[in-house]
Amino acid sequence: QKVVDAIVAAGGTAVANGDDVSTMEGGANILKTALDNYGQVDILVCNAGILRDKSFANTTEQDWDLVVKVHLKGTYCCTLPVWTWMKDNGKPGVIVMTSSGSGLFGNFGQSNYGAAKAGIYGFMRVLSIEGRKYGIRVMGLAPGAFTRMTSDLPGRKDREPDPMSLPENVAPGVLFMVSDLAADHSGKVLGVSGRGVREIKMLQTKGFNVTKPYTAQDVAAHAAEVFFPEEVQRTPA
């Protein structure tokens, strides 16, 4: 509601919706709210999330299920109704799914969150392929920002955030993604934070090519071809 109030105060129009994103009913109601108020849907940004950070040994089944349900299933539940509406009505559009450096690079204490965010990356990649014939563009966002959800992370609690780390500095990157300026970039992930905007990409090496049965020792002998050089490894923001 705070964001809605800010948009209205600035002369725009906006409505809030409090449905549960992790249910099919909630996802359908979010679409209905948009259609009831604006008549069509052009953009969906899936950004709802929670944290239950613990080391894997201390993560309960409830911790796992809750985080995966909100992030991964929530992305599915919100995307399906919008996808179906765009497809059935012949309306091109843009869907942005929020992944994370935790899912793309890994981060201690976030096995549930990292698994969900990696799943969102795979989901985004598949839909970017399937969406081509419908004119539906799908991109991934890996944001870095000081938010209510991340304010209790180690090193952030009781600390004033750097102004450059606020969500306001992620918004321009997302605006680029949903605009026609990014028309040629479906299927890509952008890391967006106070330090800038960059593409995050999954790559493979040329590898060790075989023409006959091989052994584990053969793989080890060709390790320089199999693995990336250490200097090209990428780390999250």
What do the predicted segments below correspond to?
Residues 10-13, 33-46, 52, 91, ...:
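A glycine-rich helix->loop->beta "capping" turn
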Residues 18-29, 61:
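The beta1-alpha1 cofactor-binding region of Rossmann-like NAD(H)/NADP(H)-dependent oxidoreductases
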Residues 55-56, 63-65:
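Substrate-binding pocket helix/loop in short-chain dehydrogenase/reductase
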Residues 79, 116, 124:
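Active-site helix of classical SDR
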Residues 100:
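Residue(s) in the substrate-gating loop at a strand-loop-helix junction
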Residues 103-106, 111-119:
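The catalytic Tyr-X3-Lys active-site helix of short-chain dehydrogenase/reductase
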Residues 140, 160-237:
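C-terminal helical subdomain
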